[in-house]
Each structure stands twice: as C-alpha cells, then as structure tokens.
Design a protein with these regions (language model features):
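Glycine-rich, often proline-containing surface loops adjacent to acidic residues and nearby aromatics
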Residues: 6, 66-76, 154-160
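Extracellular/secreted glycoprotein ectodomains characterized by long, lumenal stretches
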Residues: 49, 58-61, 74-79, 89-90, ...
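N-terminal regions immediately upstream of nucleotidyltransferase
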Residues: 1-65, 77-87
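Histidine/cysteine- and/or acidic
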Residues: 19-25, 65-75, 80-126
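Catalytic cores of NTP-dependent nucleotidyl/adenyl transfer enzymes across multiple folds
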Residues: 17, 21-23, 27-30, 102, ...
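Terminal (often C-terminal) interaction modules
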Residues: 1-7, 235-303
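Residue-level recognition of the N-termini of beta-strands and the immediately preceding loop/turn
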Residues: 43-46, 112, 236-240
Length: 303
C-alpha cells in the first residue's frame, strides 16, 4: 500500500492554483476591510490566518463547507465603538463587504464570524473581526446570548502544530490531511478540525515523536484510530464511527499481509472514499498458497 498512500496524499493535496485562489480570496476580503476601517489598501499586518489554510492541511476536492479562516484586526477605537454592541461590528463588516461583493445574500453574519460565499468549487472566506491584545491573544465579538466579547488564542494551536510538524518531519501534516478526508467521507461524523488536530498532535507525541521512520501509513492510521477510540467515552457519538474505521483499517492490513492488494485497497476506500486509489492486482500464489515461485526450484538443475 506504500504507493497507494503516496498517490492518495497527492490526490487530496490542494493544487498550486487552488492555493493561489484561496490567497486571492482572503486578501481581497481583508483588502476591502482595510479600505473601510483604515482608509488604506491591503495591509498584511492587519490579518492573521489560522486553521487549515495556515497549517496547509486543507484537502480537495473543495466542498461548500470549506472556508479560509482569517482574523481581521480592528483598532482600539473600533472596539470602543462596539464594546457594548458586538453584533453591530459584525453587521458593519458585512455591510462593508457587500459594497464590493454584491451578492449580499451570500454574505452572512452570525455568531462570531462573517462568511463570504464564493462560486462552487472556489474558496469561501470566514472572517473574524478581532482586537489584538498585549499578550498576543485576541478579543472577538460573539452575538449569542445577548452579545459579549471572548478571548481567542489561535496562535496556540498554530504554534503547537508547527512544533509537532517540525519534530515529526511533516508526519503531522500528512496524517491531518488523511484523517480530514476520513471525517469528510463519514457523513454523520461530527469531529471538528480543531479537536482532530489536537488528537493527532497528542497521538504523534506519544507514538511517533521523531516522525514516521520506516513505518507504513496503514499501521499509523490503524494505531491512531485505536488510540482515539480508546480515549473517547462510550456516549461520545464518534465512538461507533471510530470503531468502524479501525475495524476496516485492521481488515485492510490483514489483506495486505496476505498479498490481497485489491481487497486491502477496497477496505481503505471504505474509510477514505474514492480519492484512495484502487489496486489492480493481487500477488500470485502457487498451488500451495505460498507467494513466490510457481514451482519449487531444483538445485540439481535440468536433467
């Protein structure tokens, strides 16, 4: 399965064109807000990218739920203006954007964010207006339960991810992409990217602190599913999904040991979906069921 997993990672990794599109979209949104709040053109210092596009753990194909998460930094005066009316700030952000992005029904403000939806197959942008504090955390508006301001620390996970990814020689990023694809392929599974990444970092710290080494991805994924399954409560809705996935992973590994590459790839496709490549053939067996020679070699040579 080594080549299958190599091709699988290529299949789910965003193309350069898709990454460029994401950058164009979030820079456009932040540039629009720069003109509105600062009367200036796009300023890199006024935004903070976080989430999967910061980590580069985003996957394809791009679906309608896939957003670029970005903080837009407001100044102190704007915060004071909306200190007692956090919902008002979200509406001002929305109104500023609708002058540029004229499909106003596709720009929505709720909770803590303003979501700008673009065409199908393109990146949406989820922007959080935020006041940066002296300790490098942010205050963000929350319109729920009467409205409030909350402390948000996206840098903590960004730093944790970068440290883990460097230590594991990019295994953190690769495993995150694959497991995100599993979550996406499991339609009724509710497993946030934030929690998933935390679990991956903890798992790798315990099992693969120095990276993959010579261990194949099938073993790592099976161990990760078992690791999380053993740690979630029985009442956790993820429990049954984890059990199903780890059983399929175990079946795939056993098939692979038997040289049944086709059956192994089919089990992995049940876990990851059609982005995981099919194997075309199994290993040949002789009549005794042993891989290798069709007949025993004759050390005495031909007579």
């Amino acid at each position: 399965m080594i080549e299958n997993f190599k091709d699988f990672l290529e299949n789910i990794t965003l193309t350069e064109a898709q990454m460029k599109d994401a950058k164009t979209k979030y820079e456009g949104v932040c540039g629009c807000l720069d003109r509105h709040f600062y009367d200036s053109s796009y300023n890199e210092a006024h935004k903070f990218l976080f989430g999967s596009y910061k980590h580069r753990t985003c996957v394809r194909p791009i679906d309608p739920e896939q957003d670029v998460d970005v903080l837009f930094k407001i100044d102190k005066d704007t915060y004071e203006k909306y200190k007692d009316n956090p919902g008002g700030l979200l509406q001002e952000v929305r109104n500023a954007l609708k002058d540029t992005y004229t499909t106003t029904d596709r720009i929505k403000a709720w909770g803590k964010v303003v979501l700008v939806n673009f065409a199908e197959g393109k990146h949406n942008v989820e922007v959080l207006p935020a006041l940066e504090q002296d300790d490098n955390t942010f205050l963000i508006p929350n319109t729920e339960n009467g409205g409030s301001w909350e402390v948000f620390d996206p840098r903590a996970q960004v730093d944790a991810f970068c440290a883990s990814n460097q230590k594991t020689q990019c295994l953190t990023k690769k495993l995150a992409k694959m497991m995100k694809t599993w979550v996406r392929n499991t339609k009724t599974l509710d497993y946030s990217s934030y929690i998933l990444l935390e679990d991956i970092i903890k798992f790798l710290d315990d099992y693969y602190p120095n990276g993959q080494g010579k261990t194949n991805f099938d073993q790592i994924i099976g161990e990760f599913l078992t690791y999380v399954h053993s740690r979630v409560d029985d009442e956790d809705p993820r429990k049954s999904h984890l059990k199903t996935a780890k059983t399929r992973a175990s079946n795939a590994i056993e098939y692979e040991k038997q040289g049944k590459h086709i059956e192994a790839s089919e089990e992995w496709r049940k876990v990851f979906g059609e982005e995981f490549p099919k194997s075309e053939k199994n290993e040949a067996k002789n009549n005794c069921g042993v891989f290798g020679f069709k007949e025993a070699p004759r050390p005495w040579g031909m007579l």
